[in-house]
Amino acid sequence: MAPKRKSGVSKCETKCTKACPRPAPVPKLLIKGGMEVLDLVTGPDSVTEIEAFLNPRMGQPPTPESLTEGGQYYGWSRGINLATSDTEDSPGNNTLPTWSMAKLQLPMLNEDLTCDTLQMWEAVSVKTEVVGSGSLLDVHGFNKPTDTVNTKGISTPVEGSQYHVFAVGGEPLDLQGLVTDARTKYKEEGVVTIKTITKKDMVNKDQVLNPISKAKLDKDGMYPVEIWHPDPAKNENTRYFGNYTGGTTTPPVLQFTNTLTTVLLDENGVGPLCKGEGLYLSCVDIMGWRVTRNYDVHHWRGLPRYFKITLRKRWVKNPYPMASLISSLFNNMLPQVQGQPMEGENTQVEEVRVYDGTEPVPGDPDMTRYVDRFGKTKTVFPGN
């Protein structure tokens, strides 16, 4: 007779005498861009792709278009003018490369703004690249020749310092002002400088990090790159990427492909939330400079950048209660006046009294009471 098989239960196995404790569930809260993030919206129409491009703003504006009246410099800066001394440095506005930016208006998602939850667009990923790098192969132009003695060889191609930055966000890019020399006299007409924002002349702190020298990139071609930089202390609702390569004869190095995707989600899996259905794109792409043959004048060269952004819908908690919206509506209906100061350092308010309920008549009409930071009522005893 064949031997019987023993039971499959191992003698070494120990059974749990009681159920293992489970961690208590707690609410999970994510805050992004000032919004309380809820769940994703599902459905076939929840994902949108947008393609756009930004042209460079190197100093020369898009107009005039005539190639004999300034249009030939579009995509370039005008000739860089040097300082005549340490205290006399006043660059022309058309020699300063500036930030390119644009706002894309997305389809409206919410018809009823009184609900507790709203839908918002969320930027998930972006494909981007600099367009036109092949144009830098032009070595037959009227630039400084490589053989300066016999005026032969080839035309010196674009080379020098390069700066590449792009940003995608649900709000304008936050900028921090910082300059090389606070004595530089930037012209305020046509560009936004630190003095434009602070209403004061630049100080030595503007050569490092001055907390008051901050701005938002709200205008295209107005914020010089050498003054304004992405603010790492802010930009919670924006993703920016960049690199800088310095040098006077550094050759441009560019990689381009339509297969590289940059994910815009943070460590919590949340991308920039587009407030007011607005998507903001920003970039700077400086390739270096060209040197003209006649006067050895240097001109910055910039190239355009292409964007392909993928967006999806998200449910968020309505951050604006109906009561505050109605209150804001009534407040905006009131006329704006400019009177004497009743707030701040120069306030002309003498005294404020607050009454609540009733009490027996106090024996001291000048009695002083106040509420401390713990919410307790205190009475000041009269001094001698």
From Swiss-Prot:
Record's GO cellular component terms: host cell nucleus; T=7 icosahedral viral capsid
Main location (coarse class): virion
Name of the protein in its database record: Capsid protein VP1
Gene Ontology molecular function: structural molecule activity
One GO BP: virion attachment to host cell
One of the Pfam families matching this protein, by short name: Polyoma_coat
Residue span of motif Bipartite nuclear localization signal: 4-18
Protein task: Forms an icosahedral capsid with a T=7 symmetry and a 40 nm diameter. The capsid is composed of 72 pentamers linked to each other by disulfide bonds and associated with VP2 or VP3 proteins. Interacts with terminal alpha(2,3)-linked sialic acids on the cell surface to provide virion attachment to target cell. This attachment induces virion internalization predominantly through caveolin-mediated endocytosis. Once attached, the virion is internalized by caveolin-mediated endocytosis and traffics to the endoplasmic reticulum.
Family the entry assigns: Belongs to the polyomaviruses coat protein VP1 family.
Cell compartments where the protein resides: Virion; Host nucleus
Organism: Murine polyomavirus (strain P16 small-plaque) (MPyV)
